[in-house]
A protein has these predicted regions:
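Conserved glycine-rich cofactor-binding loop
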Residues: 14-18
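Residue(s) in the substrate-gating loop at a strand-loop-helix junction
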Residues: 139
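Alpha-helical segment proximal to the catalytic Tyr-Lys
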Residues: 124, 168-169
Length: 253
């Protein structure tokens, strides 16, 4: 199947580097006008220049900054059709009891509060217009047992549940997706060993492109993995997936 062609405006938080930058480029190639956000001017401006998009600076954990991003995007580019809540941070390898409390909490502010501030800023606008989609970048840390980084694992587990609950709240009005990009080589993961099962970097942007198209709306609220799931297969089996409650994180007894 040829790649989906898209239109409209997308806001990609954390779009100045890594997975976010790749998503911004993919959406631009698909036909969308894209605004990218971040804290490092050099990175954000470079991506915005590359895609002929809009660069927005600030902190995703600041309600004022996020609100200004949404206002600027709608003023400069038009109504936001797609939010990609991608901004996030890692937590290093410090033992949980050695990690300063403020550092531990900062991970929650960026990875959890940042997602909430982003979604709550666009949802009223999308509801008023009767259209829109939200894609939240998660992690396998939401469900895989780990041996380090309680800060990161906690934040991603929270975002996973947040995404599913939000999808249920908005069912039939706005499609909300939560996906894992896999283990992608980025600035955040550069300290990891080379022999780990790295995910091809193009898979996450390609998945987001499909989610933005509307073809996968029946999968809203489901957990989707960029590498381990075949999105076209999931779309074809959407009825079965809903009936059997697949692609979900549950307590089984």
């Amino acid at each position: 199947m040829p790649p989906d062609r898209l239109e409209g405006v997308a806001l990609v938080t954390g779009g100045g580097r890594g997975i976010g930058a790749s998503i911004a480029r993919e959406l631009t190639e698909a036909g969308m006008r894209v605004a990218v956000t971040g804290r490092t001017a050099e990175q954000v401006n470079a991506v915005a220049d590359d895609i002929e998009g809009l660069a927005l600076l600030g902190d995703v954990a600041s309600a004022d900054d996020v609100g200004s991003w949404v206002e600027a995007t709608e003023r400069e580019l038009g109504p936001i059709e797609l939010l990609v809540a991608n901004a996030g941070m890692g937590a290093g390898d410090s033992a949980s009891w050695d990690m300063p409390v403020d550092d531990w909490w900062r991970v929650q502010e960026v990875n959890v509060l940042g997602v909430h501030l982003s979604t709550r800023s666009v949802i009223p606008l999308m509801l008023d217009r009767g259209r829109g989609r939200i894609v939240i970048t998660g992690s396998g840390s939401a469900y895989l047992p780990g041996t380090r980084s309680t800060a990161y694992a906690t934040s991603k587990a929270a975002v996973c549940r947040y995404g599913e609950t939000l999808a249920n709240e908005l069912a039939g009005r706005i499609a909300v997706f939560h996906f894992s990009p896999g283990l992608v080589r980025t600035e955040m993961t550069q300290r990891f060993d080379d022999d780990l099962p790295w995910t091809p970097p193009e898979l996450a942007p390609q998945l987001v492109r499909v989610l933005a198209s509307g073809r996968a709306d029946a999968l809203a609220g489901r957990y989707i993995h960029a590498e381990h799931d075949d999105i076209e297969d999931l779309i074809a089996r959407a009825g079965e997936i809903a009936a059997d409650d697949l692609n979900s994180i549950r307590l089984r007894r």
